Every structure is written in C-alpha cells, then in structure tokens.
Regions:
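Anionic-ligand binding patches
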Residues: 2-8, 15-182
Length: 182
C-alpha cells in the first residue's frame, strides 16, 4: 500500500536523499527532495541538532518534512567525529581518520530521522555497530569506504545491500512504521 502524501526530505546532501528515497520507496512511502542548507547548531547531541534542523525545515517550507542527521562514533577516540562527522570528512577525510587509529577500531554509525509538521515532532534512531578498516576499500561516499559492519568482511562501499542494513535504513524503517499508521 503506497502512501501518496507529500513528504519532503530536506537536506543539502543529495546522497542522503537518494538513499532515503530508495529505502522509503521500498517501504511504501513516496519522498520528494527540497535542497536547502538548514540551521545546524554545534552540539554533541545528534538529537538536538536534528530537532533544530527539522524545525528550521518546517518553518522554511510549511510542509511535512523529514531530515536526517547522523554520525560516525569511533570508540578509541572517544566517539569522535560523532556529530561533527560531516566537517571532519570535509577537512581530514577518510585518510585522516585512518591515520588517527591504532588498535581499537570499533565504531558505530547512528542516524536520527526527524519528522516535523504543524503538530508533530518525532525522532527515530538507527544504530549499526562495526569497525574501521585499515585501508579504504570500494567506491562509495562519505565514510562508506572505511566502515565495516559487524558480521561482514566488506566495507559499506563494497556491499550491494547497504540500504537493507544501514543505520539510516533502521531509522527510516522505524519512521515508516510510525508514519504509515499515524
């Protein structure tokens, strides 16, 4: 059963939109893209960042919106880069992250999907545990070439079914269960 309500994904990141669109389409929800730079506070909390972005998106467009904020949290460097993942990727990149790590390579991706309309503000979280590879492998965007999910020998960039196991998929699945039954 396909919902045909207008639901807008607001972001400046077209990669996140394309992944989210593919995932939500498979779950029965049509998504449209509004490219926009949203207000982003500096915070150690993905939830706080996501709430501000969702409210900003709704106030700009006056339409039901979802936004996504995520982070890569690496255990051996106290959860860094965490909510600063985008900035760190732009400045030091995957090579810089690989150069920081010695032995403990445990990491996790966390995604926060936030829905906002006139009366609702809802957060949906997804987490995927894994580790950081020793070298970049595969072709993908962001940290995909260095993140290896638990129970895999391949990086996200090498995995064909990433959209069925990612942190983003888990958060969007929770969102779709709520949205289709609200």
């Amino acid at each position: 059963m396909r919902k045909s309500f207008d639901l807008f994904f607001v972001s400046s990141n077209s990669h996140k939109y394309r992944e989210s669109e593919t995932i939500l389409d498979s779950l029965g929800i049509r998504l449209r893209f509004l490219k926009s730079n949203l207000k982003e506070i500096q915070s150690n909390s993905l939830d706080a960042i996501a709430i501000v972005k969702a409210r900003d998106a709704f106030s700009k467009f006056k339409k039901p919106v979802i936004i996504e904020d995520d982070g890569l949290f690496i255990d051996s460097i106290d959860g860094f880069p965490g909510p600063y993942s985008s900035y760190v990727f732009k400045t030091v990149g995957n090579k810089g992250i690989l150069n920081l790590l010695k032995n403990n390579r445990k990491a996790k991706f966390i995604s926060v999907i936030t829905y906002c309309d006139k009366t609702n503000l809802q957060l949906f979280k997804g987490k995927l545990d894994g580790k950081i590879s020793k070298i970049q492998k595969g072709r993908g965007w962001g940290y995909d070439p260095i993140f290896i999910p638990n129970n895999s020998k391949k990086t996200f960039a090498e995995i064909n079914n990433k959209n069925k196991l990612s942190h983003r998929y888990k958060a969007l699945k929770k969102f779709s269960n709520w949205y289709l039954h609200k």
